[in-house]
């Protein structure tokens, strides 16, 4: 094993890749169109993955600060993960500007802008999924003569697996987040785009596809319960003693703040 590449702990599908598969429309091969960039959610999930890999931690800002409840993201392990997208995020969080720590929304916005200029975030994640054999990518020329990427799902089992894990959480909301933390991160990230989609409503579309019509109202109520139980507003995060709830709240709050800042 390369000591500079700690990919033994890298999951088969990273959180950004799971989010990509979840929102990819298998019929059109397209990602949904939103008023705001999808990549804020991808970056937020990437930071969450690095937290789960113990590459980054969340620390409280210096107590001498005016607002000592402010939480910052800091890198504690600079070794590469073996994933191009995660390694880019890690490098941005490791630079001199970010060494003292960044608030989650600031980190997401900083990384989104940087990678968007270098290479489109969605294409970076797609290339990883292509290499792993989950999707196939093609370029389609639009009416404006601009090439646009279209993705064909090759491994439907992988997409179904992501959907099934989300379905399980929605069907039976957990009392504690620890055993389904990855699913909750994906689900609550997914939910942040509800207010910013043109059509169809992404969450409504997913629920309608996974459940019988008579179940949909109950499942939507479960989603509201999950959001209430495991997402705390920024002003309340420091009041919880549950590290998983704290992590979820900081990640999802950062994604939402990045989205609404657009």
UniProtKB/Swiss-Prot annotation:
The keyword Membrane applies. Keywords: Golgi apparatus, Lipid-binding, Membrane, Protein transport, Transport. One of its GO terms (cellular component) is Golgi cisterna membrane. It is a peripheral membrane protein. One of its GO terms (molecular function) is phosphatidylinositol-4-phosphate binding. Phosphatidylinositol-4-phosphate-binding protein that links Golgi membranes to the cytoskeleton and may participate in the tensile force required for vesicle budding from the Golgi. Thereby, may play a role in Golgi membrane trafficking. May also bind to the coatomer to regulate Golgi membrane trafficking. May play a role in anterograde transport from the Golgi to the plasma membrane and regulate secretion. May be involved in vacuolar protein sorting. This is VPS74-like protein DDB_G0288371. It comes from Dictyostelium discoideum.
């Amino acid at each position: 094993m390369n000591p500079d590449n700690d990919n033994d702990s890298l999951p088969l599908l990273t959180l950004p890749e799971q989010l990509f598969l979840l929102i990819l429309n298998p019929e059109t091969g397209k990602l949904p169109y939103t008023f705001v960039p999808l990549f804020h959610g991808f970056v937020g999930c990437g930071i969450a993955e690095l937290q789960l890999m113990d590459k980054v931690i969340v620390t409280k800002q210096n107590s001498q600060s005016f607002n000592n409840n402010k939480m910052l993201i800091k890198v504690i392990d600079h070794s590469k993960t073996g994933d191009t997208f995660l390694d880019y995020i890690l490098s941005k969080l490791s630079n001199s500007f970010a060494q003292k720590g960044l608030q989650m929304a600031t980190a997401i916005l900083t990384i989104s802008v940087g990678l968007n200029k270098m290479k489109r975030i969605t294409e970076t994640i797609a290339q990883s999924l292509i290499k792993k054999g989950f999707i196939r990518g093609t370029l389609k020329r639009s009416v404006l003569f601009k090439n646009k990427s279209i993705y064909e799902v090759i491994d439907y089992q992988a997409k179904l697996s992501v959907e099934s894990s989300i379905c399980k959480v929605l069907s039976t909301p957990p009392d504690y987040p620890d055993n389904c933390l990855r699913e909750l991160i994906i689900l609550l990230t997914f939910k942040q785009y509800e207010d910013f989609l043109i059509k169809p409503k992404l969450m409504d579309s997913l629920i309608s596809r996974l459940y019988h019509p008579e179940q949909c109202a109950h499942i939507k109520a479960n989603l509201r319960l999950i959001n209430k139980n495991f997402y705390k507003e920024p002003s309340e995060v420091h009041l919880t003693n549950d590290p998983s709830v704290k992590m979820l709240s900081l990640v999802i709050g950062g994604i939402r703040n990045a989205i609404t800042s657009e």
